[in-house]
Regions:
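Alpha-helical segment of the N-proximal tetratricopeptide repeat
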Residues: 2-33
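Mid-chain, well-packed structural core segment of small domains
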Residues: 62-84
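TPR/TPR-like (Sel1-like) alpha-helical repeat modules
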Residues: 80-107, 113
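Structural signature of tandem alpha-helical TPR/SEL1-like repeats
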Residues: 17-28, 51-63, 85-97, 119
């Protein structure tokens, strides 16, 4: 069995190199071994999002939000993933929460407003 840390490191390295689809392979394996590890689920969500798999990204970011409800980045990414899936109404809540948690983040406010207009 492969070590979770090695799988996570390989996946994040591939993410950094722009190999988003390839990054999902070790990150999926790591998430299967340690599904309660928010850092793994967040990295997998990022890999899915960057490879255009928005539904899968929403699932992963949703899992991170369940594990860490005040993780502003996960809330933001969940909202963005839902927007990309055409689910603007659902995207409003996580985007609003992210913007409230980090009011200095202009990008959070922009996407919150986009979701409100699209809903």
């Amino acid at each position: 069995m492969e070590d979770v840390y090695d799988l996570f490191q390989r996946g994040t390295r591939l993410l950094e190199e722009g190999e988003f689809h390839q990054a999902t392979v070790p990150l999926r394996k790591a998430a299967a071994i340690e599904p309660e590890k928010a850092s793994i689920r967040e990295a997998l969500g990022r890999a899915y999002f960057r490879s255009g798999h928005y539904e899968e990204a929403a699932v992963e970011f949703g899992a991170v939000v369940e594990l860490a409800p005040t993780n502003d980045y996960a809330l933001f990414c969940l909202g963005r993933s839902l927007l990309e899936c055409g689910r603007a109404q659902e995207a409003r809540k996580p985007l609003t929460l992210a913007a409230q948690l980090r009011p200095e983040r202009r990008d959070y406010r922009i996407y919150r407003e986009r979701a409100a207009k699209a809903a």
